[in-house]
């Protein structure tokens, strides 16, 4: 989204996806294959204001609900195949931050997953432009965390399973071992590294910037699609 070319460094990270999962298909989502005009008013307003990060929050969920697969932010470097993780209906990982909420740099699910359907529904009746003219800066991480808490999620550093959704929540070392203070904490569990390559918040919101350095600079939605439970 936004039409910017993906930088060389990020293309290097993306090459790691194909290196470790050569049989998977890589799909990019943008204005050519997603209809902004048909999206909820929240998405249209965010797009009109050039807030690509918030547009991508919705579009990644839409693509996953439609097709299933694994979504990666383009600043995610893969270290090994994700095949062993394809045992649950859906999976996501925590980010190492004070809030201990699930991050969105890596999301995996089967097509038509109820968890993702419920996340999409959160956007149906809200506006990006608030009545006073300000913009709704609520991140998808905040929305997701609050919604999952109603299903039993607890903000802590432990792996969790949300049975109602078939959702596995992995610890931060699986997908995002770099902490908000830039300390690398890889482990035997690590499948990928989130490099926090871009920023969409200002210095006033430094904690969120350190934790969610993604998307607006990248402006590309990448979905890795594969055959999941017989779905092409």
Where are these regions (language model features)?
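Small-residue hinge/turn detector
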Residues: 58-69
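Glycosyltransferase-associated regions of secretory-pathway enzymes
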Residues: 1-56, 72-232
């Amino acid at each position: 989204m936004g039409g910017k070319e993906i930088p060389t460094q990020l293309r290097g990270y993306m090459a790691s996806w194909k290196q470790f999962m050569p049989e998977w298909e890589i799909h990019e989502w943008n204005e050519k294959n997603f209809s902004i005009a048909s999206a909820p008013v929240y998405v249209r307003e965010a797009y009109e204001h050039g807030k690509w990060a918030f547009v991508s929050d919705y579009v990644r969920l839409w693509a996953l609900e439609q097709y299933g697969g694994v979504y990666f932010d383009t600043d995610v470097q893969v270290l090994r195949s994700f095949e062993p993780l394809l045992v649950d209906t859906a999976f996501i990982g925590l980010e190492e931050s004070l809030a201990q909420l699930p991050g969105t740099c890596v999301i995996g699910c089967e097509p038509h997953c109820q968890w993702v359907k419920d996340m999409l529904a959160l956007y149906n009746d809200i506006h990006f432009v608030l009545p006073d003219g300000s913009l709704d800066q609520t991140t998808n991480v905040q929305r997701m965390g609050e919604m999952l808490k109603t299903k039993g999620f607890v903000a802590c550093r432990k792996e969790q399973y949300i049975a109602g959704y078939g959702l596995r929540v992995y610890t931060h070392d699986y997908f995002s071992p770099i902490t908000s203070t830039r300390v690398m904490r890889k482990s035997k569990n690590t499948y990928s590294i989130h490099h926090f390559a871009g920023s969409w918040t200002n210095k006033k919101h430094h904690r969120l910037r350190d934790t969610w350095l993604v998307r607006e600079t990248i402006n590309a939605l990448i979905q890795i699609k594969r055959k999941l439970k017989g779905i092409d």
